[in-house]
Amino acid sequence: MIVLGIDPGSRRCGYGVVAREGARLTVVESGVLVPGDLPMAQRLGRILDGLDALIARARPLEASVESVFSGASPRSALVLGQARGVALAAAARAGLPVFEYAPSEVKLAFTGNGRAGKDQMLRTARMLLGAAPGLSDEADALAIAVCHLARRAFAVPAAGAGRAAAARAAAARLRPSRRDHRGTP
């Protein structure tokens, strides 16, 4: 199973394509789309073009996107909503099913801490995936993909009281795709 994780943004859009074979996770491709200092419509167009090219290249079977964080200012939420719309449109145009996860849900599944900071997300990406994301947007996108793979692999329920514990247990069963610096899995 190959999944595309997207951390939408109008200035930086993180993406992470992760493959799961059994319990082994492998990063297919990850990075950040940076459309430059352009008017909003042109930035969104460049992000759409970048996501279209990525989907054609990596051929994911499903996409997962971070849902809107409601604590942002109304203007920030509107801009984020536009960037999410572009991500959803790219996935829909490619015929990919799209799954959405709250930021705290992604952090919990990825690190075991629903309030994990940027440093913890970056460290977990290195430890779990052997990846070296340069920006937190990239680490977040990888985390979104892993969260979705964990849900699919271990039938974590979409709702209910046991959701957090089940997500942590599912993430704990995933093995890194590479050895860490000490040479152990």
Swiss-Prot record:
Active site (catalytic residues): 7, 66, 137
Q: How is the cofactor bound?
A: Binds 2 Mg(2+) ion per subunit.
* Subcellular compartments: Cytoplasm
| EC numbers, comma separated | 3.1.21.10
Instruction: Enumerate the UniProt keywords alphabetically.
Output: Cytoplasm, DNA damage, DNA recombination, DNA repair, DNA-binding, Endonuclease, Hydrolase, Magnesium, Metal-binding, Nuclease
Q: Which cysteines are joined by disulfide bonds?
A: none
* SUPFAM superfamilies the UniProt entry points to: Ribonuclease H-like (SSF53098)
Citing just one GO molecular function, the answer is: DNA binding
Instruction: Name its GO BP terms in alphabetical order.
Output: DNA recombination; DNA repair
The positions annotated for binding Mg(2+) 1 are: 7, 137
**InterPro entries documented for this protein:** RNaseH-like_sf, RNaseH_sf, X-over_junc_endoDNase_RuvC
Catalytic activity as recorded in UniProt: Endonucleolytic cleavage at a junction such as a reciprocal single-stranded crossover between two homologous DNA duplexes (Holliday junction)
Q: Which family does it belong to?
A: Belongs to the RuvC family.
Q: Which PANTHER family match?
A: CROSSOVER JUNCTION ENDODEOXYRIBONUCLEASE RUVC
**What does this protein do, in the record's words?**
The RuvA-RuvB-RuvC complex processes Holliday junction (HJ) DNA during genetic recombination and DNA repair. Endonuclease that resolves HJ intermediates. Cleaves cruciform DNA by making single-stranded nicks across the HJ at symmetrical positions within the homologous arms, yielding a 5'-phosphate and a 3'-hydroxyl group; requires a central core of homology in the junction. The consensus cleavage sequence is 5'-(A/T)TT(C/G)-3'. Cleavage occurs on the 3'-side of the TT dinucleotide at the point of strand exchange.
Self-association state and partner proteins as the record states: Homodimer which binds Holliday junction (HJ) DNA. The HJ becomes 2-fold symmetrical on binding to RuvC with unstacked arms; it has a different conformation from HJ DNA in complex with RuvA. In the full resolvosome a probable DNA-RuvA(4)-RuvB(12)-RuvC(2) complex forms which resolves the HJ.
Q: What is this protein called?
A: Crossover junction endodeoxyribonuclease RuvC
Species for this entry? Anaeromyxobacter dehalogenans (strain 2CP-1 / ATCC BAA-258)
- Please name the taxonomic classification of the source: Bacteria, Pseudomonadati, Myxococcota, Myxococcia, Myxococcales
